[in-house]
Amino acid sequence: MDEWMNYEQFDRQTWHGFFPTDSVRLTQGNLDEIKSLNDRISIEDVQDVYLPLIKLIQLRYQNFLEWQMQKANFLQRSTMRIPYIIGIAGSVAVGKSTIARLISILLNKMLPDKRVELMTTDGFLYPNAELKRRGIMDRKGFPESYDMERLLKFLNDVKAGEPVVKAPTYSHQVYDVQLDKPLVIDSPDILIVEGINTLQLPSNQQLYVSDYFDWSLYVDADPDLIEHWYLQRFGMLLDTAFTDPSNYYYPYSKGDRQEAFKMAKYVWQRVDLPNLREFILPTKSRADVILHKTTGHVVDKLYLRRG
């Protein structure tokens, strides 16, 4: 079966033509501040890819608000403030975090009267101590390593209009959850939820994370390219960790670099690549938009779900 049968495909030039404007002013310096270590994003990317994407999200959001008003009228009740939730999924090292931050900034500029907040599902990983207790430390990132019940409760509270909801955070520096440093989500109009597991359908659940999404994006790239970006990022992490003994990567930065990369490649092949193939890639067809990247993190194609 053709994996693209329910999508319309657009090349970059065609996509740009749907909203050919540069009305949102950003500098390359602004973009460098939000991009992840080895990611790449340019002013041309914003104009060609992301501004049309933001316009599409804006249209969907307007429809969402209209539906909330119509539903409230039908039920003969006052309109509640219900957050619009955007899910962003894709492999590790594919650039989800950069895209999520960029979308957040652009939405804030395009919708200045709306409160836009951003979070990652990494904080809902079980702490390392719990992963070790369960004997699944080597499965970190796989579906069973997440506290899905807690994540679902968080999303349910947000959708229910709870004014203040707290989410645990994750530190890539110490490679563990930070339960004592929660992220406070305070009455957002739009919430962006980024993570590898946002579109997954765990077999032991009747309720899924994506049930709470109003719109979703999958960031796609060839697995060989993602591996290259993964190892490139690992090298940059080594370069930034060698002066900080508290950093998870510090021991690797002080040891044999070739051995460190050998370890990273092993982790990719034994953990991240199987996770991508078995649990992340199969969720691609559940996204409203698929953003495809090629060499250098350049977006060359976009796929828009029909209907």
Curated annotation (Swiss-Prot):
UniProt-listed Enzyme Commission number(s): 2.7.1.33
UniProt-annotated location(s): Cytoplasm
Amino acids binding ATP: G90, S91, V92, A93, V94, G95, K96, S97
KW NADP (keyword) present: no
Pathway(s) it belongs to: Cofactor biosynthesis; coenzyme A biosynthesis; CoA from (R)-pantothenate: step 1/5
Record's keyword terms, sorted: ATP-binding, Coenzyme A biosynthesis, Cytoplasm, Kinase, Nucleotide-binding, Transferase
Keyword ATP-binding: yes
GO molecular function, one term: pantothenate kinase activity
Catalytic activities: (R)-pantothenate + ATP = (R)-4'-phosphopantothenate + ADP + H(+)
Any single biological process term in GO: coenzyme A biosynthetic process
Alphabetized InterPro entries for the sequence: P-loop_NTPase, PanK, PRK/URK
Gene Ontology CC entries for this record: cytoplasm
Family listed: Belongs to the prokaryotic pantothenate kinase family.
Protein name: Pantothenate kinase
Organism, scientific name: Limosilactobacillus reuteri (strain DSM 20016)
High-level lineage: Bacteria, Bacillati, Bacillota, Bacilli, Lactobacillales
Gene name as annotated: coaA
